[in-house]
Amino acid sequence: MRVALFSPLPPSPTGVADYSRLLLEGLAAKFPVEAYTSGAIDATLDVPCYPWKTFEQRQTVEPKAIPVYQIGNSLHHDFIYSIALRHPGVLVLHDLVLHHSRLAMYMKSPEVVEYRADMGNTTKRDRALEKLSEYTAEVEAAYPLEGTEVAEIAIRMGGGRLLYEYPLHELLVKANKMVLVHSRSARDKLLDSCPGSNVRVVRMGIETPELVSREEARQRLGLGKKTILASFGLVTPEKRISIALRSLRRLLNEGVDVRYILVGGTVPHYDVREEAKQLGIAEHVQLTGRVEEKSFWLYAAAADICLNLRYPTAGETSATLLRLLAAGRAVMVTDQVQALDFPDDALARASLDGDEDGLFCDVMDLLRNPDRRRRLETAAREYIAAEHNPAVMFEDYAECLKEAQDIPSPSIELPSHLS
């Protein structure tokens, strides 16, 4: 059996690229493997790597490869979408909600961008409308009863929370032999939306770093002895940063000498610096921007509590959360369905109800209980070592690929532009 893995790969700035690089190393020990990507080809990969457009030509070689599609809710994955509909294989969903990236692809298309820059041009208007009609056709195919209205609202208003209600994964799921996800909750949601699909859970492999003491990490980063709260990953409203900032203000008002560090890049539509300034706490908030891996581990080691509060979720298993647990950190998450996949002793939970008062109380309770933090840190590292080491991911994938090879290719009706 040959395996053809489609994914963004390093140096693409996405966690799925790092995930796929690790996966390729493990699968190459079990099967002949080749990779397909849209960006620059990393010469350091240990497997053959090709531009994705060459796949159909190479698929004439026997034995034919079983495609493995790594899909997430970002534009880094757009090149995979159409080929995953035409060549059934194994679909790996890193997010259940794909609607944001599909809408963004159409709204950022040359046709739409050119019309927005010259809205009096009727020719450009017609081209933009034709392009957006393809998006509408996708939504209608996934949701025959309400798709037209959903697409219209999304085009006019950007969708917002509506896109979480209409995840737009249905066509991909139904067009492929098997779907892999990383949590039981994601599996259950897929089986609700696409009954009869072959959905399996594979454990996400995480490489465990060498432990660095909190004192050494702070010394290397130039941090002092303040209490440190830290959030990791792209700084977006969905990470509940606003509530964390207001909780930080409460902690400061209670006399806690605390700093909040946000480790990750920022986005144009959310000005966290301005929000901190409006709250009067800007001097207690530090933004690092996107950091290299070694700095990620140092900031994790330096923190007293790591906050991973994303809500709403796109159905993802957070690789960032798993990495923090692998580092043996005390991590607080939003208490929602996705968190049920983790043992109670491996992380702390913050209620989704209420405003910053609830998070303030949860954080203060954990800060006042160093013994509990130490127990969380130990349990977190033990959990990752047992359930998320790379070897178990490689075995899970191998079993699923062998099973998928014998599943007949499904056939579904697609919009004409995707056929």
PLM regions: where:
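Conserved donor-binding/catalytic core segment of Leloir-type glycosyltransferases
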Residues: 5, 180, 223-239, 245
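A short, well-ordered alpha-helix in the C-terminal region of glycosyltransferases
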Residues: 372-386, 399
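Nucleotide-activated donor-binding/catalytic signature segment of Leloir-type glycosyltransferases, i.e.
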Residues: 272-294
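Carbohydrate-associated surface elements
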Residues: 185, 205
